[in-house]
Regions:
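Acyl-thioester C-C bond-transforming condensing/cleaving domain
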Residues: 2, 34, 74-80, 94-98, ...
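Conserved "HGTGT" condensation-loop signature of ketosynthase/thiolase-family condensing enzymes
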Residues: 1-84, 106-109, 178
Length: 181
């Protein structure tokens, strides 16, 4: 569908300050690397990822989403009370239910009348959310939407490192865990 009456008013991000390098992950995986005789530098070589940013421990996805949402509103001519639809479009969630959007909605200070929900579809979740919001604007259901994503990879990376260091895995056995790092 081609959208005629929809635009992106602002785009903003909120990045965590802490950097977790591939070198540090490999250092923490040294028992596994030594046991399987894996060469250092393999993680960065295979992924192209030198470093990733991680939120402090116990940071919830709604905290990251709220920070990004506040930053987007600050850069726009739209006030929080004009938002009629709020979507948290991430894989990470505060909990299964209620929607993570409900927590971020409160933290941003959006109106109680705003529709809220989560859209989780891996890397396409944000694009799906844009399409949903634009379709609702085009159809006249709403005038303004705020879409956020707040991922927190720290718990997954930490659990993966722990699993790889404690499980009795061979080179083939570690492959399913690779994308988690």
């Amino acid at each position: 569908m081609r959208f005629q009456h929809t635009c992106i008013e602002s785009l903003a991000s909120a990045l965590p300050e802490e950097i977790l390098s591939s070198t540090e992950i490999e250092r923490r995986l040294s028992p596994l690397y030594e046991r399987l005789r894996l060469p250092e530098g393999r993680l960065e070589l295979m992924t192209g990822i030198k470093e990733r940013r991680v939120w402090p421990e116990h940071t919830r996805p709604s905290d990251a989403s709220a920070a990004a949402g506040k930053a987007a509103l600050a850069k726009s001519a739209i006030s929080a009370d004009q938002v009629e639809l709020f979507i948290h479009s991430a894989v990470s969630r505060d909990m299964l239910e209620p929607a993570t959007a409900s927590f971020a909605h409160r933290k941003i200070g959006l109106p109680a009348t705003a529709q809220i929900f989560d859209v989780s579809n891996a890397c396409l979740g944000f694009l799906n959310s844009l399409t949903i919001a634009a379709s609702m604007i085009e159809s006249g259901q709403i005038k303004c939407a705020l879409i956020v994503s707040g991922e927190n990879s720290r718990p997954l990376v930490e659990e993966t490192i722990n699993t790889l260091n404690t499980a009795d895995l061979d080179r083939n056995g570690i492959k399913p865990y690779f994308a988690n790092l």
